[in-house]
Structure formats: C-alpha cells, structure tokens
Amino acid sequence: MEHLWKDPVERMPEMQRLQGSFYVCAQGGGRWPQVINIWDIGSKGWEGWAKNVDRLNLKRRKAFYGDWWDTAAQWRTGGFDRLCGAAPGSPSTAEIAHQGITGTLFVHQLLTVRPGTPLDYLATVVEQQVPLWGEYGHRATGIYEVLGNQHEVVVVWATSIAGQTGLRAARDAARGLSDEVEGDDRLVAWEQRSAAF
C-alpha cells in the first residue's frame, strides 16, 4: 500500500493525482483482496490525460519511473480499469480536501443503466441521492460516467461503519425486514426511482 503513494507522478506538476486507494479485504462484496485506485487527471481535461498516458510509453517508462515500476509489478496480478469522467456535481480532489471529506468506509457503486442515460441518472443522483444519503453520514467523493461505454456509472461515497449501518437498517425497516430502527421510506423510493434508469 505504501509503495503506491511513492509514485513519482505524485510529485510532478500538472500530472494526475491519486485521489484514493481503497482495499477490499472481506465482507464488502465482490472478489477480494482487491484494490481500487481513483486517479484525478486534474483541471487540464483531455490535455492532462494525454500527458499522463504519454509518459507511460514503454521507452519513457523506465526513465520516468526508475525502479518504482519494477517494485510495483511485484504486487500487481492483473485487473481492469474504467476511464471515467466526472459528472456535473462531482467534487474534485481539491474540493474533497477543502471540504475536509474523509471516511473510514468507502462505498463504491458500479451500476448499469440504460444505454444513453448515464448523465441523466447521475444528475438524479446529485439532486436526490446525495442529500438523502448525506442525512446518513455519506458524502459523495466521485460521481462518474464510464467513458468507454454508454451504460455504466460509478458513484463513490465516504462514510463510516455507523453511517452505512444506519442507512441499511433504515432501508430494511422501511421494507418490513426489520424493526430495529424506524424505517425511511425515502430510501426505498430512491431505489425505485434509480431502477427506472
């Protein structure tokens, strides 16, 4: 984990910045152990992306990274990536830092929507889900459309175990599955609204 934060790009101006590295160890859903890295290309848009991709050229890579790349390769066993674009309302890395958004638990949603509707769905997330989940201690740290297809979105939330437990318990109670807490019908209504996409 520590090696990732030593990536030389972290110290170079106008290059991507690591927004977060999340480690799925167990009981989180999906295959584990697994690492999810979120890189922020910065304010230069596609020009910034091009600079970052260009430095990965095989001839330049060794000179740029030195031994860092070889050491990192010891732990890498495969994986996949998704090039994502921040939707309107998604905070930048600088905004996350400025607002002091932190979490002890990060909830990642990789969702499939009808082709052609990702931005409409994400606008609804910003309008409805962000304030609702905010009442349960969840702060959106990434609201992204997947740029390689027309049917996937990624939403990342910073929260705590207590925040996630409270949200899930209120949802279950609203569905009649539990009487531990008071149910929140708005959570079920949000799920029904989001399912329309």
Where are these regions (language model features)?
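Catalytic micro-motifs at enzyme active sites that drive phosphoryl/nucleotidyl and oxygen chemistry
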Residues: 24-26, 95-96
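Short, hydrophobic/aromatic beta-strand segments
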Residues: 2-4, 121-122
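An amphipathic, aromatic/His-enriched active-site/gating alpha helix that lines ligand/cofactor pockets
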Residues: 3-22, 28-33, 40-84, 128-141, ...
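Surface-exposed interaction/gating patches
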Residues: 86-164
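Short low-complexity stretches enriched in small and charged residues
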Residues: 35-39, 63-67, 111-117, 123
